[in-house]
Amino acid sequence: MGLRAAIIGAGQTRFGAVPDGPRALLRTSVDRAVASVDRGLDRDRIGAAFLATLGFGGWQIGNAAALFAEEAGIPGVAAVRIENACASGGFALQAAVAAIASGATELALVAGLEKMTDVSSARRRYWLGVSGDTEWERQAGLTFAGVYGLIASRYLALHAVPPEALAEVAVKNHANGALNPNAHFQKEISREAALAAPRVADPLGLYDCCPVSDGAATVLLASAETARRYTDTPVYIDGLGAASDHLAVQERPEPTRFEASRRAADAAFRAADCRPSDLSFAEL
């Protein structure tokens, strides 16, 4: 309990191409998180709120945090929007833990939201494109899939991995999705289907790339000292880490080594005073 914070509730919507707008998605995920708290929770006790979103479609981009607080049923609470591309949710959680650890609040709300499917392909490409390097990579015509296609090609060559091995990851991911009623894709695929899928950015095929999706997820955090007022099974956050790296891939000494991930993981292990060998479950 080194960070003195614990998760006491969580809720999410189904992910996929859904008819709900961003307001409804936020409301649903927050309501489900509050309902999941074993002994109930008075929203008036929430002292801080953090929203992670890239802001697709122009949905209240300039002041999404105020919209978040309103839809969460906590208008007036200090709310912050955090946009760090794919790491937005992790950094929002870190900010909430820091707020609790500092004593600024005993309860914090963290939500992640994207509404991506009902805007044009051109607008989606723009928002994804400006999440990477815009001075060099974007001007050269590189997309996110293109960047990771280059990284994957180098990795396969560097470690003598056959391209067919990538299909096993897609098969595993779809098998997990088939068991999750909230997953975007809820059916298994065969290795043959993954290998035969159209190429997006060689060696990455259709099943190797993430889809655009709609959905929201929320967690409620409490201080470690008060967590058991709300539940007998709080999930204590023992370690947390964050880092950054060169934005442009060509500036990285070795593109296949994600140094930000390594540094963040090292910081989390140090905070929790444990090693990778101590873990029984990991998700990347």
What is each model feature region?
Residues 1-87, 95, 155-162, 184-193, ...:
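Conserved active-site "lid/cap" helical segment
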Residues 284:
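Active-site pocket-lining segment
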Residues 1-23, 27-28, 134, 157, ...:
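Condensing-enzyme catalytic core mediating Claisen C-C bond formation in acyl metabolism
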Residues 84-114, 145-179, 219-225:
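Active-site-proximal alpha-helical scaffold in enzymes
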Residues 52, 169-173, 240:
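Short acidic/histidine-centered micro-motifs embedded in hydrophobic/aromatic stretches
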Residues 44, 103, 228-230:
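A cross-taxa feature marking solvent-exposed loop/turn segments within ectodomains of secreted
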Residues 2-3, 55-107, 115-147, 185-211, ...:
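Conserved catalytic cysteine-centered active-site region
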Residues 5-6, 47-49, 78-80, 106-109, ...:
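Structural motif
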